[in-house]
Amino acid sequence: MKKNISYGKHKTFPSKLNGLEKQHSLSKNERDNFPFLSNIPWDNANQGSDKNQLKGAKLIQEFVKHLPHKPGVYRMFDENGNVLYIGKARNLKKRVSNYTCEQRHNNRITRMIRATYHMEFVVTHTETEALLLEANLIKRLHPRFNVLLRDDKSFPYIIITENHRAPALYKHRGARTRKAHYFGPFASSSAVTQTINVLQRAFLLRTCTDSVLENRTRPCLLYQIKRCSAPCTHEINENDYRELVRGAKAFLSGKSQSVKNDMIQAMHKAAEDLDFEQAAVYRDRLSALSHIQSHQGINPQTIEEADVFAIAQKGGITCIQVFFFRMRQNWGNRSYFPKADPSFSRSEILASFLAQFYDDKPLPKLILLSEEIEEKTLLAEAFSLKANRKIFLSLPKQGERKTLVNHAYINAYEALGHKLAETATHTKLLQGIAEVFQLPQTPHRIEVYDNSHLMGTNAVGAMIVADQMGFLKNQYRKFNIRSTDITPGDDFGMMKEVIKRRFSRLIKEHGLPHESNSIKGEDEDCFSIWPNLILIDGGEGQINSVHTILSELKLDDFITVVGIAKGADRGAGHERFFIKGKTPFTLPPHDPILYFLQRLRDEAHRFAIKTHRIKRKKATLKNPLDEIKNIGSTRKRALLHHFGSAKIVASASLEDLTKVTGISVTIAQKIHNHFNEK
């Protein structure tokens, strides 16, 4: 039975902790992936104590007295309840004992110990489980003294659907819940799009939705330009289309040479039969396949499935290059720049990166590394536990595997060189912005806001973020304008709502800037959550609207707000800058700072317009079935597949509705009532 450990400095801490536990509880998906973590019984300090003035090493010494000699995970908190560090241990008592003396550690760990006001612990069955839990928590809580994976978008896949007379070819991102054959992961969305475009030319598979397919009466433009075989209007029979699907699956499964040989034979046979038009079709399809392979670069001959990781460091920046090989084909590569203190070794960074990287991604059979890591065996055991099959981690010394690692290493250094040059440029530009706007310090985080709407309809707000590393696209946010009190087209009212929602939530989650100590970033490795500069696309009226909200939230003294307004002729280069209490001013037309500010403004504008267009398109294409309660995507798809259109569903009888797969009598009655009560 566990003991509650009650040492720590708690002025307002307990309520903060309770909120933190609710905020960071495991999601259903995480409970499914990690069943042994379903209920995390954290030992925490919610009680008062005579020793509530303890902190740092002395506090840790008191915790150590009560810790077991068992594997588990520990969390360190600062005075305001923010997570400082998350670690795992084979033996909690021995591991945490290392923090009881400040003198034996480097500067990073010494600062971390001194900032510790509270700790929490959980005992796991094995060290492997502790490793998986540690990676999961680091990824969600972003403790500032850990190695952090900055950009962690899910990877796109190519899918070929099942259970249809004419399977379709789609791009897919997210959970693999759809019944389909999945091919990937691909390194980028553009790589998937390019591959699909070429596959359309090579195999003529459809890319339209099932409802579009069922309702077409004549072939679309893709058929005319030889990108689709038009199964919608039966321009191709089902057996021939099935052969095209089989060929596409074989090619994506790595049997490219076999597919090409079959096409070459078919081309020669068509030529012998004097069917030169058909021979030309095969020739063009072969050309498309060769185009894909020529752009894949290095393709392994002996490795069917592997991810390759190479790490490079220079100038305080770390780059990890990842290559994806599936079915003996190169599905692309991606560069990552994890946030890590210089005191971390390459081995430590790579090990932590791998654990976080595969927290929510499918694992390959083989993972190749450029660097030996201390806990390679433990990591392999953790990955095998997660994947329910044997996963191998290898540091190759020779052969094709070594060639792949060297190739990744070269790409890592090239990407690192580009990032260093870009960072140096951004740092200079940020220093220039501080001078131009007379800021007390160089901005470490800039947030830019803009609105977009069409005559007041489908109104949205958008926020983009930039720092010395460039645009932080994974931190962009969009806001659907909710207030019914705003007059359609009232840009000032929209901006007020966006700013209020953004910063009210920030205060709720992290407290005011002076409480969370992150507006200035007291440590260089602090994960910045508060901007010290806000840019608004607009003039005096807009910045007054923003200041009204910031004043209400008591943030007016912490954040500088600058408005960027177009000049009288609305031409680039004539922008006027507005700051509260100062005379509006302009910058020289060819000033690099002006160009950078224009880029920030234009990026916010682009993101706002894109968000608005997506919302408008969704509203335009809204299906009447979406308005019916308990009709999700699966039932909607079944109804459209059965009837062909929402219009026919609306006029269907109750008896006809019950004939649809997945539609019960109760649901059929709801659908019938919905359309007949109007």
Curated annotation (Swiss-Prot):
Residue spans of biased composition, Basic residues class: 1-13
Assembly and interaction partners: Interacts with UvrB in an incision complex.
Its biological purpose: The UvrABC repair system catalyzes the recognition and processing of DNA lesions. UvrC both incises the 5' and 3' sides of the lesion. The N-terminal half is responsible for the 3' incision and the C-terminal half is responsible for the 5' incision.
SUPFAM superfamilies membership: C-terminal UvrC-binding domain of UvrB, GIY-YIG endonuclease, RuvA domain 2-like
Keyword Lyase belongs to the record: no
A GO cellular component entry from the record: cytoplasm
Protein name according to UniProt: UvrABC system protein C
Native species: Bartonella quintana (strain Toulouse) (Rochalimaea quintana)
Region feature Disordered, mapped onto this chain: 1-25
Gene3D superfamilies (alphabetical): 5' to 3' exonuclease, C-terminal subdomain (1.10.150.20), GIY-YIG endonuclease (3.40.1440.10), UVR domain (4.10.860.10), UvrC, RNAse H endonuclease domain (3.30.420.340)
Domain UVR residue range list: 257-292
The family this protein is said to belong to: Belongs to the UvrC family.
Biological process per Gene Ontology, one example term: SOS response
Cited HAMAP family: UvrC
CDD domains the UniProt entry points to: GIY-YIG_UvrC_Cho (cd10434)
Domain GIY-YIG: start-end pairs: 69-147
Keywords: Cytoplasm, DNA damage, DNA excision, DNA repair, Excision nuclease, SOS response
Organism superkingdom: Bacteria
Classification via PANTHER family: UVRABC SYSTEM PROTEIN C, UVRC/OXIDOREDUCTASE
Gene Ontology MF term list: DNA binding; excinuclease ABC activity
Subcellular location: Cytoplasm
